[in-house]
Curated annotation (Swiss-Prot):
Listed name of the protein: tRNA-2-methylthio-N(6)-dimethylallyladenosine synthase
Organism: Tropheryma whipplei (strain Twist) (Whipple's bacillus)
General function of this protein: Catalyzes the methylthiolation of N6-(dimethylallyl)adenosine (i(6)A), leading to the formation of 2-methylthio-N6-(dimethylallyl)adenosine (ms(2)i(6)A) at position 37 in tRNAs that read codons beginning with uridine.
Family listed: Belongs to the methylthiotransferase family. MiaB subfamily.
All residue ranges annotated as the TRAM domain in the record: 372-439
Length: 470
């Protein structure tokens, strides 16, 4: 039987989808080459209302395909499944299986049971029984991998529904994490992203407050690992030893995603964020003093209940002061069951939209100005999979700088995703750069793995290492 997994939401869900694919293939399922398959799995998000609406809209489209016989079974997992549970069957009775965030490994059995009994099956567990790292994983990338170090969150942000869906923080032991990274590197992986809801509280479960900084140093020392990243930290628990580890460990990239949410102390207090703007600015200052070329990115919520124009101006002022390389900006979305959803002074949509556009205008201007500083500089890029399938055959490539910026460039030689190329930046836009023809190229084991996974024609093109003849 064939399967496909559609993913909504954050990096946690992306990695969970790799696990879902892994457990299905372990049971003999084969990945479909299209959006249609015998089994369609929707791995959902519950953070914002528009994600809910999009999901239920897509479910309606799947009904027609199921009636036409193009799909046999539909399974729904992820945070929305954990939240809505039986409501999914009420809204979409054509769904066959609903499973939660704590029991990904149960999916094959639930699918079998549903086919055998010809009934809908649901299994939602409220607690994580075993860490999901024990499940098989089907990774899409040959050069980059997620490695989960913790699941769940102990924070109580008033706008966030995630802790009630993912549970309290559970930490993996350092030895298990390092063993997984070593195994990945032996398979050709060059870049690892350590993943957790709040990575810098890693170690709280086994009583080691310096565990995350220590993990960065040990992971960065693994031979063959060229790039090490992490997401996401929390300003309240972020400490100097993590910045020191970033500075001292060559493999750790000069990039830091530090969620701000608001520049107003009053709103941060209402959000129950456990830090204030001064603490945030101190972290940024220390990071830039020790790592001058670091790129800082962030998350910002616009229109939180009770946000005044003065509060919003505090956010604009802080954004102007910090000068983020990029920012994920969101309009506040009330989530039922969170304290913020029942707060007074919910902000009208037109005001939220107007503020959101002002913030975007400011951040886009800053991002462009910061990117223009790179024009004329040489940067080493990790070649990534581009958006167009034919781009590599036309000698057009996409890569990421060490600080995470996206660069489009050309190269006379055939490159593989996972190779490195050094280019000179010749043009800047707010959220991408353009490089001249590659100056140097460095082949990697990750590129070799990509060749093994792709067709013979591509392999012949690449292995010559010569310019294409037109």
């Amino acid at each position: 039987m064939t399967y496909t997994v559609r993913t909504y939401g954050c990096q946690m869900n992306v990695h969970d989808s790799e696990r879902i694919a892994g457990v299905l293939e372990d049971e003999g399922y084969v990945k479909s080459g299209s959006d249609d398959a015998d089994v369609v799995v929707l791995n959902t998000c519950a953070v914002r209302e528009n994600a809910d609406n999009r999901f239920y809209g897509n479910l309606g489209q799947l009904l027609q395909k199921k009636n036409n016989g193009r799909i046999r079974q539909i399974a729904v997992g992820g945070c929305l499944a954990q939240k809505d549970r039986h409501k999914i069957f009420e809204k979409a009775p054509w769904v066959d299986v609903v499973f939660g965030t704590h029991n990904l490994g149960s999916l094959p059995a639930l699918l079998r049971r549903s086919r055998h009994n010809k009934t809908a099956e649901i299994e939602i567990k409220d607690f994580l029984e075993t860490f999901p790292s024990s499940l098989p994983v089907r990774r899409e990338s040959n050069y980059s991998a997620w490695v989960s170090i913790s699941v769940g969150c102990n924070n109580t942000c008033t706008f966030c529904i995630v802790p009630s869906l993912r549970g309290k923080e559970r930490d993996r032991r350092p030895g298990d994490i390092l063993a997984e990274i070593s195994a990945l590197v032996s398979e050709g992986v060059l870049e690892v992203t350590l993943l957790g809801q709040n990575v810098n509280t890693y170690g709280v479960e086994f009583g080691d407050r310096s565990a995350f900084a220590s993990l960065l140093r040990k992971a960065g020392a693994i031979e063959g690992l060229e790039r090490l990243k992490f997401t996401s930290p929390h300003p309240a628990a972020f400490t100097s030893d993590v910045i020191d580890a970033m500075h001292d460990t060559q493999a750790v990239l000069p990039q830091l995603h530090m969620p701000l949410q608001s520049g107003s102390d009053r709103i941060l207090r209402a959000m129950r964020r456990s830090y204030r703007a001064g603490k945030f600015l101190k972290i940024i200052s220390e990071a830039r003093n020790k790592i001058p070329n670091i790129a800082i990115t962030t998350d910002i919520i616009v229109g939180f209940p009770g946000e005044t124009e003065e509060d919003f101006q505090d956010t604009l002022n802080l954004v102007a002061e910090v000068r983020f390389a990029s920012a994920f900006t969101f309009q506040y979305s009330p989530r039922p069951g969170t304290p913020a959803a029942s707060m007074p002074n919910q902000i009208p949509g037109d005001i939220v939209q107007e503020r959101y556009e002002r913030l975007l205008d400011l951040q886009n201007r800053i991002a462009l100005e910061e990117n223009r500083k790179l024009i004329g500089k040489e940067v080493e890029l990790l070649v990534t999979v581009g958006g167009r399938k034919d781009s590599m055959l036309d000698n057009r490539y996409t890569g990421r700088t060490p600080c995470g910026r996206l660069v489009h460039f050309s190269c006379l030689h055939q490159l593989r995703p996972g190779d490195f190329a050094t280019v000179k930046i010749i043009y800047a836009a707010p959220y991408h750069l353009i490089g001249d023809n590659a100056l140097t190229v460095r082949r990697t084991p990750a590129g070799d793995v990509w060749i093994q996974k792709n067709d013979t024609r591509s392999a012949q093109l690449v292995s010559l290492g010569m310019p294409r003849i037109r």
